[in-house]
């Protein structure tokens, strides 16, 4: 399965929040933000902090898609 945080970026736009504001309110580092931007895995605790900061659920910021191998 591949992970995508496109829902997170859309939610930020919908809430009128900048990435820096999210970083500050969720207490996450710049390197973690870079991982999110690259759709890389991050610790579940970080995702929970993001959900808390945005008052949302995990499925509103993360999408899993099948990873088809040929």
Functional labels for PLM-detected ranges:
Residues 1-20:
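A short, Lys/Arg-rich alpha-helix, primarily the initiator
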Residues 2, 11, 35, 62-70:
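Short, charged recognition helix plus adjacent turn
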Residues 9, 20, 34, 48, ...:
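Residues within the helices of the helix-turn-helix
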Residues 12, 23, 51:
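The alpha-helix within a helix-turn-helix
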Residues 16-34:
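Short alpha-helical DNA-recognition segment
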Residues 40-52, 68:
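Short, basic-rich loop-to-helix N-cap that marks the start of a DNA-contacting helix
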């Amino acid at each position: 399965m591949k992970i995508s945080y496109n829902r997170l970026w859309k939610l930020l736009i919908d809430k009128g929040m900048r990435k820096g504001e999210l970083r500050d309110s969720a207490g996450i580092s710049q390197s973690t933000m870079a991982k999110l931007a690259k759709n890389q895995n991050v610790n579940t605790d970080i995702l929970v902090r993001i959900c808390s900061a945005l008052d949302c659920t995990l499925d509103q910021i993360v999408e899993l898609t099948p990873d088809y191998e040929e």
